[in-house]
């Protein structure tokens, strides 16, 4: 697999997840696996949060937002990535937003649907989930990273274009850059290399913000994307 990343991006990603206190072995227990839901103009979305065991009083942990690919949900994505095991060992929280099958029959994030605004509506719901987790859990808001697979990777990149100041790092695994599609048909074309880049809606604050480092992971024999 080809990994397209600079050394500085990799170092920045590791730094954003590094605990502020000395790392210690996690106490016995598997941690907490908690459900949640947010509602907004684009409807409602469920999510899951993993919290490692033994969080001390006043301790703040980094947060990693994980966006699944098509046909997945929080449970299957957590199981396939084993991110909760890593979070327990390295001591950080994990947020898994879930796409609703009523919003997309294949369970894909609608990152491409910028023409009708569905992409931006879903991005807003994911940010609501991030904000809710920050309120209810001991999150270090200065150390939040986001990662996604396939459609989740594209949505992660879209989210960062709208809120670059909220994230310390972004990881795209087998995704398509946002702005290369505006409908289901053009998204399918973009997956096979037929891409016409168009400007994305953003805000002056986003344009002036410091952009987080990007790590791109993509197989050179990928026949899907």
Predicted regions: what they are:
Residues 115-137, 158:
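Alpha/beta-hydrolase active-site loop
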Residues 66-69, 96:
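Structural cue for short, hydrophobic secondary-structure segments
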Residues 1-63, 75-81, 89, 93, ...:
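A domain-start/cap signature at the N-terminus of enzymes
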Residues 208-214:
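Short, proline-enriched alpha-helix->beta-strand connector loops that line the catalytic pocket
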């Amino acid at each position: 697999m080809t990994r397209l990343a600079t050394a500085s991006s990799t170092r920045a990603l590791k730094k954003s997840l590094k605990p502020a206190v000395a790392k210690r072995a996690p106490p016995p227990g598997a941690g907490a696996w908690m459900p949640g839901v947010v509602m907004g103009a684009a409807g409602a979305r469920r999510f899951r949060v993993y919290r490692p065991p033994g969080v001390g009083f006043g301790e703040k942990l980094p947060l990693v937002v994980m966006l699944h690919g098509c046909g997945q949900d929080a449970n299957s994505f957590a199981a396939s990535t084993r991110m909760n095991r890593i979070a327990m060992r390295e001591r950080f929280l994990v947020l898994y937003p879930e796409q609703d099958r009523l919003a997309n029959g294949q369970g894909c994030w609608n990152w491409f649907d910028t023409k009708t605004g569905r992409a931006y509506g879903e991005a807003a719901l994911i940010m609501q989930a991030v904000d809710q987790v920050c309120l209810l859990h001991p999150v270090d808001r200065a150390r939040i990273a986001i990662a996604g697979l396939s459609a989740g990777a594209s949505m992660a990149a879209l989210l960062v274009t709208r809120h670059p100041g909220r994230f310390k790092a972004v990881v795209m695994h087998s995704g398509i850059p946002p702005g290369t599609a505006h409908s289901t048909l053009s998204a399918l074309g973009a997956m096979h290399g037929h891409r016409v880049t168009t400007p994305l809606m953003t805000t002056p604050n986003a344009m002036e913000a410091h952009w987080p480092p990007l790590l791109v992971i993509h197989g050179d024999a990928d026949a899907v994307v």
